[in-house]
UniProtKB/Swiss-Prot annotation:
One of its GO terms (biological process) is intracellular manganese ion homeostasis. Belongs to the CCC1 family. It comes from Oryza sativa subsp. japonica. This is Vacuolar iron transporter homolog 3. Keywords: Ion transport, Iron, Iron transport, Membrane, Transmembrane, Transmembrane helix, Transport, Vacuole. It is a multi-pass membrane protein.
Length: 249
């Protein structure tokens, strides 16, 4: 796997004699070119810049960190939908052998969970969006005061999209929740229905755990076992609590 190297360079912000004679940042150079330089902060006498190696320096030129974060969030959202709906269906199955009751409870859990995930993600990301916009405006005002309006405008950068984050979270939850619904929602006998939900949920939990570990560079087998045990514990707890509640009332 190609590795991307980052280095922090401190350079003086005092005006240089000439742009043509100004030395480049002390970053990694090859073929007379410097890797991409991004200003991340401005102090009183110096600017802090991050130098990212491009493809010519063995870094591949592509930053996969943002993509990995989105994929990991999608895997976690799907895992939430899977465990929530499966536990809900198993819990309802503990007090009723009706296949229709299990199916309706699963659909209700899917809709409620997807809406909850979308709204929560929207509020969270929109708060982050507001914070980053406010920080960018403060940096722009500070730079204008230091440079008397002669400095170049800073790029807006990548700001999070609250609508995209909400849609992705709801979609991931829905995909995970559909698995136990499709596995056991239409099986009429009670025992095969519960077994189908448990089997499909277990297989999906192991797959989601291994995929999340692969995206994070961890051990897939260990992560799959951990997620699988957690899902089993959630389903067992839901079944036991509702069974006890039904016996008491």
């Amino acid at each position: 796997m190609a590795m991307q190297m980052n280095s922090v360079v401190h350079v003086s912000t005092s005006p240089s004699p000439s742009p043509a004679t100004s030395p480049p940042p002390e970053g990694k150079q090859e073929h007379g070119e410097v890797a991409a330089v991004h200003v991340v902060g401005v102090g009183d006498d110096e600017a802090v810049m991050v130098v990212k190696d491009e493809e010519a320096f063995g870094g591949g030129g592509v930053d996969y960190s943002g993509r990995a974060q989105w994929l990991r969030a999608a895997v976690l959202g799907a895992n939430d939908g899977l465990v929530s709906v499966a536990s809900l269906m198993i819990g309802v199955g503990a007090v009723s052998e009706s296949g229709r009751a299990m199916l309706v409870s699963g659909v209700a859990g899917l809709v409620a969970g997807a809406c909850s995930m979308a709204i929560g993600e929207f509020v969270s990301v929109y708060a982050q969006y507001d914070i980053e916009v406010a920080a960018a405006r403060r940096r722009r005002r500070q730079r204008r005061r230091r440079c008397d309006g002669d400095g170049e405008e800073e790029g807006s950068g990548r700001l999070p999209s609250p609508f995209k984050a909400a849609a992705a979270s709801a979609l991931a939850f829905t995909v995970g929740a559909l698995l136990p619904l499709l596995a056991g929602g239409f099986v009429r006998p009670w025992a095969p229905r519960v077994a189908a939900v448990c089997a499909a949920t277990s297989a999906a939990l192991a797959g989601f755990g291994a995929l999340g570990a692969a995206l994070g560079g961890a051990s897939p087998a260990r992560s799959a076992a951990r997620v699988l045990l957690g899902g089993w514990a959630a389903m067992a707890a839901c079944y036991g609590v509702l069974r006890l509640f039904a016996n008491l009332y």
